[in-house]
């Protein structure tokens, strides 16, 4: 699992499976998009306006990448 925060876009992405694959985007809420693979497994979670939706400090204990 990889957690990436894009500060410029305030986007938090949680990759549950880092293998390259084709995915479909399934919007489940105004600010939450799931990446679903061909077998309907969730392989990623995208949270838009992340700083408003989650406490980003929770992820300090997780090894995450911060990008510009």
Question: How should these model regions be labeled?
Answer:
Residues 1-68:
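Small, basic N-terminal interaction modules of short regulatory proteins
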């Amino acid at each position: 699992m990889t957690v990436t925060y894009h500060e410029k876009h305030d986007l938090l992405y949680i990759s549950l499976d880092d293998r390259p694959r084709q995915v479909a985007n399934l919007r489940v809420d105004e600010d939450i998009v799931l990446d679903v693979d061909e077998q309907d497994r969730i392989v990623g979670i995208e949270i838009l306006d992340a700083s408003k939706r989650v406490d980003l400090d929770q992820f300090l204990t997780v090894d995450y990448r911060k990008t510009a």
